Each structure stands twice: as C-alpha cells, then as structure tokens.
Design a protein with these regions (language model features):
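Short S/T/G/P-rich N-terminal loop/turn motif that feeds into the first structured element of a domain
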Residues: 1, 7-94, 103-113, 131-155
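Acidic/histidine-enriched, beta-strand-rich ligand/metal-binding domains
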Residues: 86-88, 118, 126
Length: 155
C-alpha cells in the first residue's frame, strides 16, 4: 500500500542502516535503543537523532529559535543532510542529521555560537519535559534524495 502512494506521488525514499553507538535520554519514558554508553571511540561518518518533547508553555520560545540554527547547520563543514521529524507536530520533535565525522558534528553542536545559546536556553528555561540524543554508526544507505544517494555525493 505504501509503495502505491510513493509511486503515485513520484516520491523518493532513502533508507539508512544504523548501529546505535552512544547516547542518553528517553523516548516516551523508554530507552528505545537499550543501554548505551554516553561516549564511544568511533570517529567516522555519523548520524544523530535528537528528540524532545517540548513543554506547551515553551513552544513559542522553542520555535522562535529553530530557523536560525537550522539554516546554519546546512552550511556547516562536514554536514551531509538532515531531516525534521514531527511525531506530534509542533510538540514532539526530532532532528535526524548526518555528518562526515563526529568532530564535524561536535563542532556544530558545541562550537557554533547560535546553537550553543539555544542549548543553554533549553536547560535554563526548562523547554523540554523529555529529551533523547543518540549517535549512530552508518552501516549502509540505499535510495535517493533529490536524485542522488546522500552519502555517495559527500564521500
């Protein structure tokens, strides 16, 4: 049935094969990837899932800060691609991003001023009722985005 819709709308699909290597936090009060170390030695191509449940009283502050950070992520060194995922639109949000290596991802996450400021605001102003951060080793990728396999273009 899904294949019929994909064909009808001429949609592209891409599938990433992933191995969770490090992370922390909960998804609906569960450790959905099991017990993970908070750090690993893996430094290669990496995918990151950041997921949060935003407090209703903090929605305006959260969304006011999204566009500025998202636009800078796309131009960051080592950035390959990202996908926004809305489990419950506007409230339960996730970003799945792919990077050439862990260092490039960390440079964006912890060295880019705008992102650093947003991280500080989320903690200081208690934006989230729950959050989860998981990093994955990418073991494979099939399909296309805009006509190309996103990992083959950047290799």
């Amino acid at each position: 049935l899904i294949r019929n819709w994909i064909d009808l709308f001429n949609c592209e699909t891409v599938t990433y094969l992933l191995e969770p290597i490090e992370g922390h936090g909960l998804w609906d009060r569960k450790k959905v990837f099991g017990e993970l170390p908070t750090k690993s030695d893996y430094e290669g191509q990496i995918a990151v899932l950041t997921r949060a449940t935003i407090r209703l009283s903090k929605l305006k502050q959260f969304w006011k800060n999204v566009d500025g950070v998202a636009s800078k992520m796309a131009g960051s060194e080592g950035f390959i691609n990202s996908y926004g995922i809305g489990e419950i639109p506007w409230i339960k949000q996730a970003t799945f991003s792919i990077w050439q290596n862990k260092q490039a991802m960390k440079n964006f996450a912890y060295q880019m001023k705008d992102h650093q400021e947003v991280i500080q605001k989320t903690r200081k102003e208690n934006w989230y009722s729950e959050d989860m951060f998981v990093r994955f080793k990418i073991t494979g990728c099939t399909g296309t985005v805009n006509g190309v396999n996103p990992l083959k273009v950047k290799l």
